[in-house]
Structure formats: structure tokens, C-alpha cells
A protein has these predicted regions:
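A shared catalytic/ligand-binding motif for oxyanion handling
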Residues: 1-184
Length: 184
């Protein structure tokens, strides 16, 4: 037992027999990859984004089924396609989540897009706007410096006319250029 060193050797103090065991003398200088005192990263929040083709949400039963299914997955924002809900509006659901929807008033038997935003981050939504019954976007204020723009689209099938596909691409480009955000 007497062969163990009880004192930590100090560089440049060969004459002095005293060892300094206080925290400041044992602190790592930070030059190595395996530094013991690393700077802590600021806390981050993960945004879980999901998409779902619901085929219809005309009745309240369909909406309740969707809310029940969302309880089983991790999500913060869910983009919905083919909702078939009339009009462009913002609705607060029974669960406290918010539904942002868009479809034409006259032809709501097909198409329609929407976002469901979790009640935890609903206060971060600064703007939502629909370009057509196939394209909608949402702007989130991530922090005091950055904003995030989410564009959700319902693409036509491969058998659709080229005009419909070109119109979709034009709508997406228009939505992208409409907002001045750091991230899209």
C-alpha cells in the first residue's frame, strides 16, 4: 500500500514537494479531443413531421379516428392530403391541436390539403396560406432568429395531364418564393 503515489506531479514545480489537488489545477485545458470539460450544446427540440393521405375527412368520425391514430405516433406537425374539407380555415380540435385546411368551396369532392399542428407548438405558427387546393404552407418561428417554412402538396397521379403537374410545380415555386425564411 505504501507504493501508491499520493501526490499528483506538477509541471514546472520539481523543487516543490507540495501537490495541488484543488479543482482548478486538475481542470483539463481543453486541447484534447477527449476533453473532460466540454462546452455544453444548447438544448434542441426535435420536430417530428408526418404526412398522411386520409382520403376523406368530411365527417367528424373521420377526424376523431385520425386523432386517435395520432396518439400512437410521435408527431408535432402532420400534413394531410385529400381531406375533402370545404374552404380555407383554422380549427381548434377537441384535443387542443389545430387544423389548418384548404380546399375549393365549389369542388370539394376531391383534393384538399391540411396541416395538424400539435398544441405544444401551436403558438409558434406565425402564418399559414394556401396557394391552391393542392399546395399549402405554414411558417413557424423556431427561435428569435430563425423561421421555418413547411410546404405541403398533394401531387396528381402519374396519369394526370402535364398541365396539372406543371401547375403544381409552379404553385410550389410560388409558395417557396412568397416567404423570406431561413429554412424551407
Amino acid at each position: 500500500m505504501s507504493s501508491f503515489k499520493t501526490k499528483v506531479p506538477q509541471v514546472g514545480r520539481a523543487q516543490c514537494s507540495e501537490s495541488h489537488l484543488d479543482a482548478s489545477s486538475l481542470m483539463d485545458s481543453g486541447g484534447d479531443k477527449k476533453s473532460t470539460f466540454r462546452k455544453l450544446k444548447p438544448p434542441t427540440t426535435k420536430i417530428h413531421i408526418a404526412t398522411y393521405n386520409c382520403r376523406t375527412m368530411r365527417t367528424d368520425d373521420h377526424l376523431e379516428e385520425l386523432e386517435e391514430e395520432l396518439r400512437n405516433i410521435k408527431w408535432v406537425i402532420t400534413g394531410l392530403c385529400e381531406t375533402r374539407l370545404p374552404g380555407e380555415k383554422r380549427t381548434t380540435l377537441k384535443s387542443g391541436h389545430t387544423l389548418y385546411q384548404n380546399n375549393s368551396e365549389t369542388n370539394y369532392s376531391q383534393g384538399g390539403v391540411a396541416f395538424i399542428v400539435h398544441r405544444r407548438i401551436e403558438h409558434k405558427v406565425t402564418k399559414y396560406h394556401s396557394i391552391s387546393d393542392r399546395v399549402i404552407y405554414l411558417v413557424l418561428q423556431i427561435n428569435s432568429r430563425y423561421r421555418l417554412q413547411l410546404i405541403h402538396c398533394y401531387a396528381p397521379t402519374s396519369t394526370a395531364h402535364d398541365e396539372q403537374i406543371e401547375q403544381l410545380y409552379e404553385d410550389i415555386a410560388y409558395a417557396k418564393n412568397l416567404e423570406n425564411t431561413h429554412y424551407v
